[in-house]
Each structure stands twice: as C-alpha cells, then as structure tokens.
Amino acid sequence: MAATATHADEIANHPLISRSLELAGAGMDVVGYNYMTARHEPDGERYPNRVIVGSETYPPEIARNWDIVERCAHVIGDFTWTGWDYLGEAGVGVPAYRPGEGSFVAHYPCQLAYVGDIDITGFRRPASYFREIVFGLRKDPYITVQDPTHYGQQPMQTPWVISDNYASWTHP
C-alpha cells in the first residue's frame, strides 16, 4: 500500500474500482472507503442516496478529509489509521533518514507500528493535537520541535507518517 500511496487518488477513480463499488455499494446502507478520499465528493453526485464514511485514511490527510466531511452531508465521518498505536506492522510510521532505517524495514527492536495518535503507553503524540485543531476542538497553539540532528534533511516516510516532531525543548 505504501508504494501505491502517491497514486491513491488515480487508483481510487479507476473504472474497475468504480464498477466494483457500484455493485457492492448498491446493497449497503453505508459504504466505507479505505484510502479513497478522492471518491467522496464525485460519488455523492453519482449516487445521491449513498452514505459514505472514510473507513481507513492516511493520518497526514486529516485536514483534507475533515473539510470534505464538513462540506458534504453524504460523508458521515473519517477513521484515520490509527487512534492508538499497536504491536505489529513494525515501523510503518517511523520516519527514516537513510535507506533501510524506518518504515516497514525498521530494525529490531522496533515492534510498534508508531502511527497512533496515542502511543502504546497512553500518551498523546503530536498528531493528536493536530487532529484536535483540525476538528476545531483546540484554539491554543501546540508547539513541537524536530530533532536538530536531522536539521535540513528530508525524511523518507510512508503515507502514515505525519512528521517526526515531538513536544520537547530538550534533546538527548
């Protein structure tokens, strides 16, 4: 999935996907779209009685997705992957600065996906504050910093990585 993410909108709008969704969606009260945000608005026009939910979406796209939810009455919500971090898919959310460091090739002892708004121990990560701001639930700023050892470098990351920022003023 990570390799196709840059073309996700094109794939979502492919005629084969359209035909499959037309058949499957006809028998559903609510149709869940995984990583197909590009279909939310046009499918509302094509199928005026269809109710859509973003059943799995990329965390960095929350501002785009939530704008669609607020503007389109037929889109009833968005479920970002994922709220709470978990064991498995080790490293999918780990940004890397050298080939072979993060993502799905993260080295041992990496066991967490590292994609949750809440980490495995129950602490909120910066992404959760960004989401809170997008939802209009937070007006105060939330300030994060990047590790200065990577200053000026562009991370290699999967589409599930928002950033490598953290809420701290000290660095190890």
Label every PLM stretch briefly.
Residues 1-172:
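Substrate-binding clefts and catalytic carboxylate motifs of secreted carbohydrate-active enzymes
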